[in-house]
UniProtKB/Swiss-Prot annotation:
Compartment annotation: Cytoplasm
GO MF annotations, alphabetized: glucosamine-1-phosphate N-acetyltransferase activity; magnesium ion binding; UDP-N-acetylglucosamine diphosphorylase activity
Gene name per UniProt: glmU
Chain intervals for the UniProt region annotation (Linker): 230-250
Protein name: Bifunctional protein GlmU
Cofactor binding summary note: Binds 1 Mg(2+) ion per subunit.
Length: 456
């Protein structure tokens, strides 16, 4: 159906005392992203004209963490209830738009459920998201007459009979802006908590003869809030289980779905295999037939077809062409680039460095600010000395170069095509094409040498 323009209000003023943290509750992360950011993203995906964020505790931290240009910051200086929070945002409501109310500590609400709620909202009435619980203790109960919603009674204000009701309020609702402002102005704090409840607008709407339509989410986890770290950890596992299931159904082989974390977006080809305890962060692309070993962390990187990443390797902001092999225990830092068939072995670190086609750095090596050609062998213990304490400098190594073990290349320096660097050499000047560079101290030998003996 055709929807009205819509703005979203996100309540995020709570302190989160039970988190036992200096960080505002809504900034605690789920799947690598602040809880409230999940809600903001859902609002934006839904096409919100404006997102009003009602904040209180930790406002400076919130503003530092959330840089969404679409946010309108609304201060709730005193936390006097959900109705009071909405009253602070009400001056920003347009009369002819719908207002959707969400919560910064309910991170798994889906766009599909919110669109269903939006579509179900009757003209001039309220769309309400509700669920039925076997044990509704502590939640506001939905009251009905002849099947029609008449109001919401908070648990502390409910009678014994009302407490038997299993349908509860999730707190998520949508109504017209003009109606919302009128109802908010009529709220009182005449209740056990002495607070202004947004839920009281349901009874006000019913008294005006307005229709209230209740819809249910696809999954209960969508409307579960977070008040402590235990609840947050449970929602994290729910989320990760859902992501793992989607990947498995899409053809990705997860060796143990319970030991896989997706903290971003994963784009993948066919026949991808991911072993246990792998973490994917940010935006990651895996080509066809990629294999990732146990304990790896891949962040904001592109991995080409037929690449194999061995266990306990960290890849961040890197690009790998096809058929590269990495690890185990390798680290590719931002700006690392491997061309087709390149190999980076155990205990090799790269940063802002390119390794050419078929080139190899087998072990115990640091390559920083370096451009390395094709078919180059980098021996064990090689270091590009790129930093003088103030500035970074570049090392350039041409095609078909052989770099012996325990070599130091003091940048800026260039090694020409086909050159050979003898083991143990410290390169401080450019090396010509097809030349041999050697800087070792001449070996001496003392015949009949005896090691010192400790005196007894």
């Amino acid at each position: 159906m055709l929807n009205n323009a819509m703005s979203v209000v996100i309540l995020a003023a709570g302190k989160g005392t039970r988190m036992y943290s200096d960080l505002p509750k809504v900034l605690h992360t789920l799947a690598g992203k602040a809880m409230v950011q999940h809600v903001i993203d859902a609002a934006n995906e839904l096409g919100a004209a404006h997102v009003h964020l009602v904040y209180g505790h930790g406002g400076d931290l919130l503003k530092q963490a959330l840089k969404d240009d679409n946010l309108n910051w609304v201060l709730q200086a005193e936390q006097l209830g959900t109705g009071h929070a909405m009253q602070q945002a009400a001056p920003f409501f347009a009369d002819d738009e719908d207002i959707l109310m969400l919560y910064g500590d309910v991170p798994l609400i889906s766009v599909e459920t919110l669109q269903h709620l939006r579509d179900a909202k009757p003209q001039g009435g309220i769309g309400l998201l509700t669920v039925k619980l076997d044990d509704p203790t502590g939640y506001g109960r939905i009251t009905r007459e002849n099947g029609k919603v008449t109001g919401i009674v908070e648990h502390k204000d409910a009678t014994d009979e009302q407490r038997q009701i299993q349908e509860i309020n999730t707190g998520i609702l949508i109504a017209n802006g003009a109606d919302m402002k009128r109802w908010l102005a009529k709220l009182t704090n005449n209740n056990a908590q002495g607070e202004y409840y947004i839920t009281d607008i349901i009874a006000l709407a019913y008294q005006e003869g307005r229709e209230i339509v209740a819809v249910h989410p696809q999954r209960l986890s969508e409307v579960e809030g977070v008040n402590n770290r235990l609840q947050l950890s449970r929602l994290e596992r729910v989320y990760q289980s859902e992501q793992a299931e989607k990947l498995l159904l899409a053809g990705v082989m997860l060796r143990d779905p319970a030991r896989f974390d997706l903290r971003g977006t994963l784009t993948h080809g066919r026949d991808v295999e991911i072993d246990t305890n792998v973490i994917i962060e940010g935006n990651v692309t895996l080509g066809h037939r990629v294999k990732i070993g146990t304990g790896c962390v891949i962040k904001n990187s592109v991995i080409g077809d037929d690449c194999e990443i061995s266990p306990y390797t960290v890849v961040e902001d890197a690009n790998l062409a096809a058929a590269c092999t990495i690890g185990p225990f390798a680290r590719l830092r931002p700006g690392a680039e491997l061309l087709e068939g390149a190999h980076v072995g155990n205990f090799v670190e790269m940063k802002k460095a390119r390794l050419g086609k078929g080139s190899k750095a087998g072990h115990l090596t640091y390559l920083g600010d370096a451009e390395i050609g094709d078919n180059v062998n980098i021996g064990a213990g090689t270091i590009t000395c790129n930093y003088d304490g103030a500035n970074k400098f570049k090392t350039i190594i041409g095609d078909d170069v052989f770099v012996g073990s325990d070599t130091q290349l003091v940048a800026p320096v260039t090694v020409g095509k086909g050159a050979t660097i003898a083991a143990g050499t410290t390169v401080t000047r450019n090396v010509g094409e097809n030349a041999l560079a050697i800087s070792r101290v001449p070996q001496t030998q003392k015949e009949g040498w005896r090691r010192p003996v400790k005196k007894k």
